[in-house]
């Protein structure tokens, strides 16, 4: 507070402009070091960034608290990042659903059959249904049927997206005899970790396939 008072006393109504565009001028104020000035500038830029992001998300009825959460993950580059691929919100931010990301994407002109939409939809289906059923995977045919219905797209693009997600390592496939079980990588790794801990605790010494 004392520092802010000194800045306003020195630069008056130009104080914010000086901080944003010519913050080295703050060295004229006694007691302010270069590192302190850098901290002031970073805090200022962050506040401006948060305000812009809150306003950007306001038109999509995303709460300020969720907007701040997005900022904490993606930083000052949030807006162009979201404009480039709104589905990262559903993929990476707790509390922002696929439907909300889809609404933003449609308003930005994304195609219903775009890969990023189908891929995000598939991941959201696995998360949602796995959570409801208490499993960490879904059978591949179930994912395909759910995605075709939810996304209103043909089966071919859904199968292509699953193949691409498997290639990129975002999904993991395990053959269960009658079907392939599809996991989100995060769920798969978590399940293996739990299994390995249980084996260590039991003293059994065989490998997990």
State what each model feature region is:
Residues 1-180, 197-201:
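Accessory alpha-helical DNA-binding modules that contact the DNA backbone or grooves
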Residues 178-209:
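ASCE P-loop NTPase motor cores of helicases and related translocases
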């Amino acid at each position: 507070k004392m520092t802010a008072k000194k800045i306003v006393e020195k630069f008056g109504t130009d104080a914010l402009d000086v901080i944003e565009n010519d913050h080295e001028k703050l060295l004229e104020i006694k007691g302010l070091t270069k590192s302190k000035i850098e901290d002031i500038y970073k805090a200022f830029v962050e506040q401006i960034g948060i305000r812009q992001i809150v306003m950007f998300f306001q038109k999509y009825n995303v709460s300020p608290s969720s907007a701040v959460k997005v900022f904490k993950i993606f930083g000052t580059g949030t807006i162009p990042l979201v404009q480039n691929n709104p589905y990262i919100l559903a993929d990476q931010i707790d509390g922002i659903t696929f439907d909300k990301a889809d609404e933003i994407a449609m308003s930005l002109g994304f195609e219903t059959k775009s890969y990023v939409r189908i891929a995000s939809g598939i991941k959201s289906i696995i998360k949602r249904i796995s959570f409801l059923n208490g499993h960490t995977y879904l059978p591949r045919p179930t994912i395909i049927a759910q995605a075709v219905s939810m996304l209103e797209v043909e089966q071919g693009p859904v199968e292509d997206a699953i193949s691409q997600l498997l290639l990129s390592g975002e999904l993991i496939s395990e053959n269960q005899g009658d079907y392939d079980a599809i996991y989100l990588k995060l769920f798969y790794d978590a399940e293996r970790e739990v299994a390995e801990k249980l084996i260590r605790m039991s003293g059994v010494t065989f490998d997990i396939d």
